[in-house]
């Protein structure tokens, strides 16, 4: 199988979508998981104020609200968690996102003290973290907090990973990539925008430049700069459209380079890495 055929088969992106149908598909998927696992009563999600967590949060709250209405069980709850490292540059966007999704519960856990303590402990042991490695510490601390909250509320951690992110592996292993359920997978970036538009989301939340904003020395570094390819090019590629050869090569290189992130820990029986 050619590399592009394999990528398209793995990422499951449709050439065209009906935004309303895809919204219902994600909501019903989330509800079905709760109905199957009746001991689960909550969804937990970290909210950044960007497109992906805004969309995921809205879908999660819709699913929880419908579960309460259908079952009469008020124990079903959605926890939207703000996880700043110190002060977040686009805090106003996060507040706008929270107001849009109207979560049952809003929590704020500032991760700065925990991350700084970890960095200091490593330095004391002779391990000096680079700015990039410290950025991954932030992502993993955020996920640790979300799992702690989920543990106390019969919950699962919802992920924001979509196919345009999955194909490039643009997430931290066991950080924002370490979730329980991903309702956006199968959608690319522009399709996510279409869902938010259908849901009546404020435009500025899905038109802003995507950024992981993990590095102290490169605040708000755009994803597209870090990747060396635009989301429009990634979206076109995943929809089977023509893209410049250099963009296709970069996407395919990211896919191969980050394949380990899309698997559990490698065992002697795995051969994808060979």
From Swiss-Prot:
The UniProt annotation places ATP binding at 46-53, 160, 189, 211
User: Which CDD domains does this entry report, sorted A to Z?
Assistant: NAD_synthase
Which residues are deamido-NAD(+)-binding? 140, 173, 180, 260-261
Q: Which GO terms describe its cellular component?
A: cytoplasm
- List S-S links within the chain: none
Look at the named UniProt entry and state the broad enzyme category this protein falls under.
Answer: ligase
Keywords, comma-separated and alphabetical: ATP-binding, Ligase, Magnesium, Metal-binding, NAD, Nucleotide-binding
Q: Which HAMAP family match?
A: NadE_ammonia_dep
Family annotation (PANTHER family):
NH 3 /GLUTAMINE-DEPENDENT NAD + SYNTHETASE, NH(3)-DEPENDENT NAD(+) SYNTHETASE
Q: What is this protein called?
A: NH(3)-dependent NAD(+) synthetase
- Organism, scientific name: Listeria monocytogenes serovar 1/2a (strain ATCC BAA-679 / EGD-e)
Gene for this protein?
A: nadE
């Amino acid at each position: 199988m050619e590399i592009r055929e394999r990528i398209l088969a793995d990422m499951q992106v449709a050439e065209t979508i009906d935004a309303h149908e895809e919204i219902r598909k994600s909501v019903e998927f989330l509800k079905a998981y709760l109905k199957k696992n009746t001991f689960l009563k909550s969804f937990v999600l970290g909210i950044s104020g960007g497109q992906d967590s805004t969309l995921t949060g809205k879908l999660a709250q819709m699913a929880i609200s419908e579960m309460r209405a259908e079952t009469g069980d008020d124990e079903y709850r959605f926890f939207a968690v703000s996880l700043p490292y110190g002060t977040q540059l686009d805090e106003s966007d996060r507040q706008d996102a929270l107001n849009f999704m109207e979560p049952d519960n809003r929590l704020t856990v500032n991760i700065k003290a925990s991350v700084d303590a970890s960095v200091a402990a490593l330095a004391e042991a002779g391990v000096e973290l680079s700015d990039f490695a410290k950025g991954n510490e932030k992502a993993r601390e955020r996920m640790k907090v979300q799992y702690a909250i989920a543990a106390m509320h019969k919950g699962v951690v919802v992920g924001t990973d979509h196919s345009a992110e999955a194909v490039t592996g643009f997430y931290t292993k066991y950080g924002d990539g370490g979730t329980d359920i991903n309702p956006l997978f199968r959608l690319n970036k522009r399709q996510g925008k279409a869902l938010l538009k259908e849901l009546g989301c404020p435009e500025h939340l899905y038109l802003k430049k995507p950024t992981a904003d993990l590095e102290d020395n490169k605040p708000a570094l755009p994803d597209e700069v870090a990747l060396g390819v635009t989301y429009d090019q990634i979206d076109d590629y995943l929809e089977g459209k023509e893209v410049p050869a250099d963009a296709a090569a970069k996407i395919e290189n990211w896919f191969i380079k980050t394949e380990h992130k899309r698997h559990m820990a490698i065992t002697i029986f795995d051969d994808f890495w060979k």
